[in-house]
Swiss-Prot record:
The record marks L338, T339 as: Cleavage. InterPro entries: bZIP (IPR004827), bZIP_sf (IPR046347), CREB_ATF_subfamily (IPR051381). It is found in: Endoplasmic reticulum membrane. Transcriptional activator that may play a role in the unfolded protein response. Binds to the UPR element (UPRE) but not to CRE element. Preferentially binds DNA with to the consensus sequence 5'-T[GT]ACGT[GA][GT]-3' and has transcriptional activation activity from UPRE. Binds to NF-kappa-B site and has transcriptional activation activity from NF-kappa-B-containing regulatory elements. Residues 354-377 have a biased composition (Basic and acidic residues). It is a single-pass type II membrane protein. CDD domains: bZIP_CREB3. This is Cyclic AMP-responsive element-binding protein 3-like protein 4.
Length: 395
């Protein structure tokens, strides 16, 4: 092998296109886009023998696993023999000069790059000969081609405990943990999530990222937890509401009992008041009957006394009696034809009135006049007005 040709060395060190395909990267758990690998003419010549073997994951035939592993060259030996720090090809510009001193090596901690590939095609071939190996580790010390693996999928410096997985020769198979490949975020799960995942029979890794199925399971579990929490909250609110209603009912029932007691007391008081009222009504009825009888007797007595006493007081006694000198004749307002009977009646009435008005001496004179008239064979004639009436009749 001529190591002086840098392009051929690059072509040999360049993996096939479908090594870092999307499926291989997803199987490794590396959620990063596959790098675009530029294919040159010499790379096509170097990979022509690989691609002609078959359509497996690495482009290998089932009978050529050893030849595939021999194609990888340890870059540490190449850089250790003759390599300049500024040259990316891994060889010096003048490989024919054996007298050139080797380039001084850096005193800093060695930088190691590992490319991990899941060789699924090799599992079937190595099933009978030995244990199956799922990962291939290739050490690329101090050689960082940008077209192979992006920066997010590479580890610039390995920890000290990672040197235990580094084998002295390239192409050897060694299991490399995922923590040494890229910095992963830790997945924190609560006790409830762990319990539900255990019930589902699913065990999630402790680091992100997760696969689609694992994400679906985790979302389902968290949705169950949220539904459970919301149901618990609703039950708690319902219980608080019911407790509040029960407390209000208890308070209302206690107040109702107190009011019932007050109502009973008021009813008893009302009954006593009604009994007292009836007693008063009976007493008033008895006293009212007695008073009515007494008052009736008093009124009858007073009325009888009034009937006895009032006739003795005549209202005509205070008036002076009219004498004959006080009499004045009046003119006749109308001419009437009077019969003898009417004349006598009128005369009698006038005589009675005159006698009542005349003093006692005049009464004696009237009596003598009456007797005189009776002796003459006729009724006594009134004086004054009576003579005027008779004179009018005669006319």
């Amino acid at each position: 092998m001529d190591l002086g040709i840098p392009d051929l060395l690059d072509a040999w060190l360049e993996p096939p296109e479908d090594i870092f395909s999307t499926g291989s990267v997803l199987e490794l758990g590396l959620h990063c886009p596959p790098p675009e690998v530029p294919v040159t003419r010499l790379q096509e010549q170097g990979l022509q023998g690989w691609k002609s073997g078959g359509d497996h994951g690495c482009g290998l035939q089932e009978s050529e696993p050893e030849d595939f592993l021999k194609l990888f060259i340890d870059p540490n030996e190449v850089y250790r023999s003759e390599a300049s720090p500024g040259n990316d090809s891994g060889t010096s510009e003048d490989p024919c000069r054996p007298d050139s001193p080797p380039a001084p090596r850096a005193t800093s901690s060695p930088t190691l790059y590992e490319v991990v590939y899941e060789a699924g095609a090799l599992e079937r071939m190595q099933g009978e000969t030995g244990p199956t190996v799922g990962l291939i580790s290739i050490q690329l010390d101090q050689w960082s081609p940008a077209f192979m693996v992006p920066d997010s999928c590479m580890v610039s410096e390995l920890p000290f405990d990672a040197h235990a997985h580094i084998l002295p020769r390239a192409g050897t198979l060694a299991p490399v943990p995922c923590t040494t490949l890229l910095p992963c975020q830790t997945l924190f799960l609560t006790d409830e999530e762990k319990r539900l995942l255990g019930q589902e029979g699913v065990s999630l890794p402790s680091h992100l990222p997760l696969t689609k199925a694992e994400e679906r399971v985790l979302k389902k579990v968290r949705r169950k937890i949220r539904n459970k929490q919301s149901a618990q909250d609703s039950r708690r609110r319902k219980k608080e509401y019911i407790d509040g209603l029960e407390s209000r009912v208890a308070a209302c029932s206690a107040q109702n009992q107190e009011l019932q007691k007050k109502v009973q007391e008021l009813e008893r008081h009302n009954i006593s008041l009604v009994a007292q009222l009836r007693q008063l009504q009976t007493l008033i009825a008895q006293t009212s009957n007695k008073a009515a009888q007494t008052s009736t007797c008093v009124l009858i007595l007073l009325f009888s006394l009034a009937l006895i006493i009032l006739p003795s007081f005549s209202p005509f006694q205070g008036r002076p009696e009219a004498g004959p000198e006080d009499y004045q004749p009046h003119g006749v307002t109308s001419r009437n034809i009077l019969t003898h009977k009417d004349i006598t009646e009128n005369l009698e009435t006038q005589v009675v009135e005159s006698r009542l008005r005349e003093p006692p001496e005049a009464k004696d004179a009237n009596d003598s006049t009456r007797t005189l008239l009776e002796k003459m064979g006729g009724k006594p004639r009134p004086s004054g007005r009576i003579g005027t009436v008779l004179h009018a009749d005669e006319m």
